[in-house]
Amino acid sequence: MSSRKELANAIRALSMDAVQKAKSGHPGAPMGMADIAEVLWRDFLKHNPQNPSWADRDRFVLSNGHGSMLIYSLLHLTGYDLPMEELKNFRQLHSKTPGHPEVGYTAGVETTTGPLGQGIANAVGMAIAEKTLAAQFNRPGHDIVDHYTYAFMGDGCMMEGISHEVCSLAGTLKLGKLIAFYDDNGISIDGHVEGWFTDDTAMRFEAYGWHVIRDIDGHDAASIKRAVEEARAVTDKPSLLMCKTIIGFGSPNKAGTHDSHGAPLGDAEIALTREQLGWKYAPFEIPSEIYAQWDAKEAGQAKESAWNEKFAAYAKAYPQEAAEFTRRMKGEMPSDFDAKAKEFIAKLQANPAKIASRKASQNAIEAFGPLLPEFLGGSADLAPSNLTLWSGSKAINEDAAGNYIHYGVREFGMTAIANGISLHGGFLPYTSTFLMFVEYARNAVRMAALMKQRQVMVYTHDSIGLGEDGPTHQPVEQVASLRVTPNMSTWRPCDQVESAVAWKYGVERQDGPTALILSRQNLAQQERTEEQLANIARGGYVLKDCAGQPELIFIATGSEVELAVAAYEKLTAEGVKARVVSMPSTDAFDKQDAAYRESVLPKAVTARVAVEAGIADYWYKYVGLNGAIVGMTTFGESAPAELLFEEFGFTVDNVVAKAKELL
């Protein structure tokens, strides 16, 4: 039987060989953390390589995602669908082993990591999901939700601001089943970290309310095992295991230096490392007895089978809850949602109201909340402004089975935590802040889109229309930056009806996040036929029209739709054949078939005016170089909103004048 050290050395060998073959990558972290990974994965981790999506598996997150060969080695050795050929194709086009781990590409990878600090944030989200789901579904004698979230993190994660945001919240929420391993090797890309990172990390985490285990020898299996047992015994606090490790462990000339961090060791050094580790096998060769000891297929299947029996007993005792749990873990919509949502939208159209779209959003949450027990909402300390609370909201810090998170002023942390909640399954998270502060959350927003995760992002106070707070709080370029993010769906509704349609779209969307861009100020409701009402979901539609072919088309979104309608009415009265297109979602519109797009924006009509209180440049793709744009080209100013709209040209007279220049 191979020793624990030999089992860990299998990870080291695969990691240095794959990085060498790829001619790029990060061998240092996998080599340094191999002993920790061996103990966690072989002695503690509850998982089934034959079913990577088993609901009650433990979640493992590699927050220091550059060390991706660590997780690929573990998945390969324990029996996941990751053959040796894929390890040989590390970092190559269309392989299952991309440079940083990507969820959806590789069976067993729980989240996409690489931007440092976001993995631990996702892990906090997963731990919140586990704790909340357990409170919602477990019953006396039936613990069907009972698993841990384990995260590996390095010095880079610790330095990133997001780790401060999310680890602080994790302590406050007492996430006892979150266990993080700190790879304390003292090295980052620039060299030894003493020059730029001298925090007392243990005291920092104790101040957050974590259980901290100091001075673990990260290369001694017995010490690591004792620490994990201690952490699992602490149920009311997350645990940080501070593991002293040597980066590039086993490399005679590069261990303990930044040379092993982000580059292949080189053939000569790899040969010396094999010698030092006593690893007698050729590159990519693993002896059968080491495979046999690593193989987790049988044990994993046994664990899942035992859980299946538990779940069958639960289903017998609580059939309704079991059916609901299954539906939610599959991410399926309730069967009656579509019909009830359409009924709500039709009722709104029949009962006009002049309200802010942020208020319309709250009304939609109020209507959809009772239909969607999977909602897990939250705001970055702006609930009274974002209007994200509804009558059924219960904060999880007050009621463990609740459905609302007070994130505090942590926009980046909030968004990345919500990604983790979404990845875990069983919930549909929505988050909120002022649109301006999407800037703080930006990379987690991008990661949601990249990972195709469901999340409804509620962004209010969407333009100069917020008024007196001034340019620090007035978004200009933010909507455009969301629109150009691949796989992000962005909606800027013009009234309560479009707001509800946008919410329905975001809730039903299965393959990515949806951003709702909402006003502070009240917006007039537009009249619509049944056909126009149905066409809102297509992203853009004809709201006002003329007989026959128009000479001129206005395209507008959000608060500027009523301005475009007023300009249209003025020109129509003067005998101009004009049309107004409301375009709440450019991405939804762009997905429509060519015939529909042509029916809304005929190519023959080149006189087009886009009106939006956001950055002007975005609209050239719709108005062409011969069109006109009434938009923002500078930052805003501090003044009452109505004066600002006048100052920046958002008036009927100016819009009409721009239109006439094209005729």
Curated annotation (Swiss-Prot):
GO terms for cellular component: cytosol. Its cofactor is Mg(2+); Ca(2+); Mn(2+); Co(2+). The modification N6-acetyllysine is found at residue 46. Substrate binds at residues 26, 261, 358, 385, 461, 469, 473, 520. It catalyses: D-sedoheptulose 7-phosphate + D-glyceraldehyde 3-phosphate = aldehydo-D-ribose 5-phosphate + D-xylulose 5-phosphate. Binds 1 Mg(2+) ion per subunit. Can also utilize other divalent metal cations, such as Ca(2+), Mn(2+) and Co(2+). The keyword Metal-binding applies. The active site is at residue 411. Signal peptide: none annotated. Its EC number is 2.2.1.1. GO terms for biological process: pentose-phosphate shunt; pentose-phosphate shunt, non-oxidative branch. It comes from the Bacteria. Mg(2+) binds at residues 155, 185, 187. The record marks 26, 261 as: Important for catalytic activity. Thiamine diphosphate binds at residues 66, 114-116, 156, 185, 261, 437. The keyword Zinc does not apply. One of its GO terms (molecular function) is magnesium ion binding. Keywords: Acetylation, Calcium, Magnesium, Metal-binding, Thiamine pyrophosphate, Transferase. Belongs to the transketolase family. Catalyzes the transfer of a two-carbon ketol group from a ketose donor to an aldose acceptor, via a covalent intermediate with the cofactor thiamine pyrophosphate. Thus, catalyzes the reversible transfer of a two-carbon ketol group from sedoheptulose-7-phosphate to glyceraldehyde-3-phosphate, producing xylulose-5-phosphate and ribose-5-phosphate. Homodimer. PANTHER family: TRANSKETOLASE, TRANSKETOLASE 1-RELATED. This is Transketolase 1. It comes from Escherichia coli (strain K12). The gene is tktA.
